From Swiss-Prot:
GO molecular function: catalytic activity, acting on a protein; histidine-tRNA ligase activity; transferase activity
UniProt-annotated location(s): Cytoplasm
UniProt key word Chloroplast: no
Oligomer and partners: Heteromultimer composed of HisG and HisZ subunits.
Pathway the protein takes part in: Amino-acid biosynthesis; L-histidine biosynthesis; L-histidine from 5-phospho-alpha-D-ribose 1-diphosphate: step 1/9
UniProt lineage: Bacteria, Bacillati, Bacillota, Clostridia, Eubacteriales
Protein's recorded name: ATP phosphoribosyltransferase regulatory subunit
GO biological process: histidyl-tRNA aminoacylation; L-histidine biosynthetic process
Domain of life from the UniProt record: Bacteria
Gene3D superfamilies in alphabetical order: Bira Bifunctional Protein, Domain 2 (3.30.930.10)
Gene that specifies this protein: hisZ
Note: This function is generally fulfilled by the C-terminal part of HisG, which is missing in some bacteria such as this one.
SUPFAM superfamilies for this protein: Class II aaRS and biotin synthetases
Keywords: Amino-acid biosynthesis, Cytoplasm, Histidine biosynthesis
GO cellular component: a single term: cytoplasm
Length: 421
């Protein structure tokens, strides 16, 4: 086993220095936005019982979960998602009466990625959940918060695609097709495989009504601006189908009034995980990033799996994909701090620490050199791209060396901060 001690497992990676700073920056920006919107943060354990994720229509295949056993032989998993643990917590730990309950989170999740394809199996997910209320205002707040999250991070070249899980369900509700056939239909429509879908539906003319086939054939093409919804309404007569489409229209109108509709498009063929969702669904894409960066929607039946029926809606952001997008568009505006190093002999360390604390109170990074010689300190400072070195002894003056200009200046100790700020 010693041969593996220098490596990370498949799908795992180390995050170092600049990338770590970028990640913490993004997480902090999102946390602050959630807090200012009235969301309270929640943290769930990394290990959960497998049962938390083992229920009908949950969207994560058990083959994608990292499993292990506790000392009693019970199956545990590294949590593959945050929404279901939040459902467990709300149903069992939160004594809340005045809904809605607005929660947010930032956490690592784990999903086995067998093909890898540059993807990792450990993902940082950040998001919000609005629990205990079922209305269009809650749906709008979730989508608007998703848009504002991306804008807050500096992204502009993105689209939030809105779909409706109810629409497809209502289309096939009265058709005599089994789960396997529904699964095939969903994949063909989601992947916009027009030819294969048409051929498949030709084989099903005896069990699927002609009007239904006509709508299903059009579903992969029903994407674009809000006009797509009006086109869909002209194709259907069923009241429940029309009601599902009206929900998207109502949501879009709110987003439009807020002035954010330019970031929204429609995709009625977005139906891959609709068994999990019960209403409006959405995904966020950034031009140049291959995978979606966020996803969400309404899932009114999920918390019922934990014995507490509460309507819910929310979204999760893939932090790793967000950082990729921010790099592409060069909008990672991380504040840069001035950086100095302080050098002294051991006998002046007491004085050095007092001066260092004065420097740090002015939001300047101040590192006390651990090198013994001036030459080694200068060499170390250059490797760290430090601007200035402060030399301290027992005098009332201190020497400040500017590395970039190769110049030194002695200043009275009471006034030295002016030379750094």
């Amino acid at each position: 086993m010693d041969k593996l001690k220098k490596y990370t497992p498949d799908g795992m990676r180390d995050i170092l220095f600049k990338e770590c700073e970028e990640k913490l920056y993004v997480e902090k920006k999102l946390r602050n936005l959630y807090k200012l919107n009235g969301f309270s943060e929640i943290i769930s354990p990394t290990l959960e019982f497998y049962d938390v994720f083992n229920f009908e229509n949950q969207p994560i295949a058990q083959e994608k979960m990292y499993k292990l056993f506790d000392r009693n032989g019970r199956i545990l998993v590294l949590k593959p998602d945050m929404t279901m643990p939040i459902g467990r917590i709300v149903a069992t730990k939160v004594n809340y009466k005045d809904y809605p309950l607005k929660l947010c989170y930032t956490s690592n999740i784990f999903r086995i990625n067998e093909n890898l394809n540059g993807k990792t199996s450990e993902i940082t997910q950040s998001g919000i959940e609005i629990i205990g209320i079922e209305n269009i205002k809650a749906d709008a707040e979730v989508v608007i918060t998703a848009i504002e999250s991306l804008l807050q991070l500096g992204l502009k070249n993105f689209k939030i695609e809105l779909g409706q899980s109810k629409f497809f369900k209502e289309i096939i509700k009265n058709e005599n097709i089994n789960k396997e056939e529904v699964f095939t239909l969903k994949n063909l429509i989601e992947n916009k495989n027009y030819v294969a879908l048409k051929d498949y539906l030709k084989e099903k003319t005896k069990i699927i009504k002609a009007d239904t086939i006509k709508i299903l054939e059009q579903l992969p093409r029903m994407f674009g601006d809000i006009g797509v919804v009006y086109e869909a309404k002209n194709l259907v007569n069923d009241n429940e189908q029309l009601k599902a489409l009206d929900e998207i229209l109502s949501l879009y109108k709110i987003i439009d009034k807020v002035g954010l509709s330019k970031y929204v498009s429609i995709d009625l063929g977005m139906i891959q995980d609709i068994d999990y969702y019960t209403g409006v669904i959405f995904k966020g894409y950034v031009e140049g990033v291959g995978d979606y960066i966020l996803s969400g929607g309404r899932y009114d039946k999920l918390i019922g799996n934990f014995g507490c029926d509460l309507p819910s809606t929310g979204f999760g952001i893939n932090i790793d994909n967000i950082i990729e997008a921010l790099r592409i568009y060069e909008v990672l505006n991380i504040r840069k701090f001035r950086n100095v190093i302080l050098h002294c002999e051991n006998k002046y360390l007491n004085r050095a620490y007092k001066i260092a604390n004065r420097v740090r109170k002015n939001n300047i990074i101040c590192e006390i050199s651990l090198r013994d010689t001036i030459e080694d300190t200068i060499k170390y400072a250059r490797s760290k791209c430090v601007d200035k070195i402060i030399f301290i002894d027992n005098r009332e003056f201190i020497k400040i060396y500017d590395i970039n200009f190769n110049k030194s200046k002695e200043v009275i100790i009471d006034n030295f901060l002016e030379e750094l700020i």
